[in-house]
């Protein structure tokens, strides 16, 4: 809510990830939801949701992928049927970040026009709520501070006023989601740079503490070559990330750069 630019956000995420990457992932998903509402929401939706997303009383989840539809958005099967002033949602979503603790889910569904629409699903934090259930908690090899779940919808009703963008937003969910995911990808890159920085610093400390042949291994040229290559790749990744952030701040499309 401070109005900071994307470049500043990128630096913050990088530093957070240097200490604990899961925290940055939680913030990223929340930020994607806020960005979608700020860019494409109606004035009423902005006034209703954004203040609570800024003060922390609402945590957002982003829900696009499905068991048989990861990056293939054209294969979405989760459907919403219009019933008067409500939409009735049925289907299953996969890899939902913040799913359990969220109060708002940015839900991509297929509507009767066979296009994708984004619904703003309000719920109570927890594993079940009025036709919404967490059907599976997904275990991961790492990144375990970030909850990732499968969520099922059975006849869950969403008010028509919660269609992102209002009546004009019907059928435009894919465009809204991909626009916000540009920012999300910059965040992922920032996280990677932060973790790489932490790894490089750990390697430097170890190279100064570990001794062989009576000297720190840092003084062996073979190790110096390895550390120099690490530093070069780290700085290259950082500059590529910053370039994408600066272009986004300038209003450019950055799907390739991100």
Predicted regions and their residues:
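A structural signal for short hydrophobic beta-strand segments in well-ordered beta-sheet cores
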Residues: 78-81
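A short core secondary-structure module
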Residues: 86, 90-133
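Short Gly/Pro-enriched turn/cap motifs at secondary-structure boundaries
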Residues: 26, 53, 68-71, 95-98, ...
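Internal helix-loop-helix
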Residues: 1-59, 96-104, 248
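Glycine-rich beta->alpha junctions and the first turn(s) of the following alpha-helix
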Residues: 18, 132-235
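Active-site pocket-lining segment
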Residues: 228-250
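Charged, glycine-rich active-site and insertion segments that engage polyanionic ligands
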Residues: 253-258
């Amino acid at each position: 809510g401070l109005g900071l630019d994307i470049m500043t956000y990128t630096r913050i995420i990088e530093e957070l990830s240097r200490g604990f990457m899961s925290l940055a992932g939680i913030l990223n998903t929340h930020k994607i939801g806020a960005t979608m509402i700020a860019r494409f929401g109606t004035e009423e939706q902005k006034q209703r949701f954004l203040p609570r997303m800024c003060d922390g009383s609402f945590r957002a989840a982003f829900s696009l992928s499905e068991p048989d539809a990861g990056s293939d958005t054209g294969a979405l099967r989760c459907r919403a049927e219009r019933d008067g002033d409500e939409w009735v949602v049925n289907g299953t979503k996969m890899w939902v970040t913040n799913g359990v603790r969220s109060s708002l889910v940015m839900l991509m569904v297929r509507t009767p026009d066979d296009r994708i629409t984004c619904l703003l699903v309000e719920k109570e934090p927890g594993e079940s709520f009025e036709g919404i259930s967490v059907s599976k908690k997904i275990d991961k090899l790492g990144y375990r501070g970030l909850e990732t779940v499968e969520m099922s919808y059975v006849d869950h009703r969403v008010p028509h006023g919660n269609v992102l963008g209002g009546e004009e937003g019907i059928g435009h969910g894919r465009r809204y989601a991909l626009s916000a995911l540009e920012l999300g990808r910059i965040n992922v890159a920032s996280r990677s740079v932060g973790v790489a920085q932490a790894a490089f610093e750990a390697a430097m400390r170890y190279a100064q503490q570990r001794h062989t042949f009576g000297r720190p291994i840092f003084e062996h040229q073979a190790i110096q070559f390895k550390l120099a290559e690490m530093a070069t790749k780290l700085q290259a990744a950082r500059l590529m990330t910053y370039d994408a952030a600066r272009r986004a701040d300038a209003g450019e499309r950055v799907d390739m750069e991100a």
